[in-house]
Amino acid sequence: MASARPPSPEELLAASEKAFEAGRFEEALHRADEAIRRDGRSLAAHHYRAAALAELGRLEEAREAYEAALALDRDDLDLLVGAADFHVNLLQEDEAERDLVERGIALARRGAKLARKADDPALEGEFRRLEAAGLNQLGLSREALRVLQDAEAALPDSVEVMLEKGFALYELCRFGEARAALLRAEALDRDEPWTQHYLGLVAERAGDEEEARRRFGRARKLDPDAFPKPIALSPEAFDAAVEDALASLPDAVRRYLSNVAITVEDHPSDDDLLAPDPPLSPAILGLFRGAPYGQKASMDPWSHFPSAIVLYQRNLERFARTRAELIEQIGITLIHEVGHFLGLDEDELWARGLE
């Protein structure tokens, strides 16, 4: 009896695609690996392998798989979309790594250039949106807004473009414009949880607590994993959490903090946010006020005031589901602000792991 004919690389690719579209990512990965064993230079197989690994949460393997695919063809538009999206979105869900975000931006820019040559304005617009997402990740929201002008012109009905625009405007403290962009996104898709979340943040800044609660609640209903109910403490309980966080810090950090007043406010004030140019993010967890350590002789009159670190309770509470998580985040924030007290800028903080 003749043995069954082994599936061809094309059949394995079709099986991988079918499994991927059905959400069976382990099977999709298995079929893609089989296809690669049959044809090691199959770009589609390498792409499916990378995408399946990403969906399975095996992010470092997925990053390596995307690089292997790009080594085969760095000009394939479908691959560039997937790789750029992976670097600026999925890979950054927990915490942005600057070099990886920059890699995603570079891929998006290359894709936009190739899409323009191919006379595909919609695809060029998608690449520009991904570039803007990466720029927003790096805190370069003004540059992101400029890029989003091209994306919006190409994709005027894109929820993702309007949401990214709303996020950039929010980060730049242009809250009225942010609300307008987010309402446009909501009109296109009422069930996008991130739109509801950012509308809640804008309402909170405006002092509309009722709308903020409604928006946050809707975001939580639409995506409870992304938007769990935050811990909410009384001022006294929050102060106690700060004390516990201080007690958990290394001696060297506590020694520096002995020279710094620590205060708590609900939200950053407009004055604090708009003092630098570009403005600070409204989502900041803390802020160092005063002159860095050893610079009290500055001609700046503000430097003669005592140094202080302000913790923003509502922003910190959004990062925590439990008191233990809140204490941990307060400690991280204090260490970050100690870096500012020591005169480190944002790039130096990032390099030292204090960002």
Question: Where are these predicted regions, by residue range?
Answer:
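Structural marker of alpha-solenoid helical repeat scaffolds
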Residues: R38, L72, L114, A118, ...
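TPR/TPR-like (Sel1-like) alpha-helical repeat modules
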Residues: R103-R110, A187-P193, H197, L201-P228
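Active-site scaffold of zinc-dependent metalloenzymes
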Residues: P282-G331, F341-E355
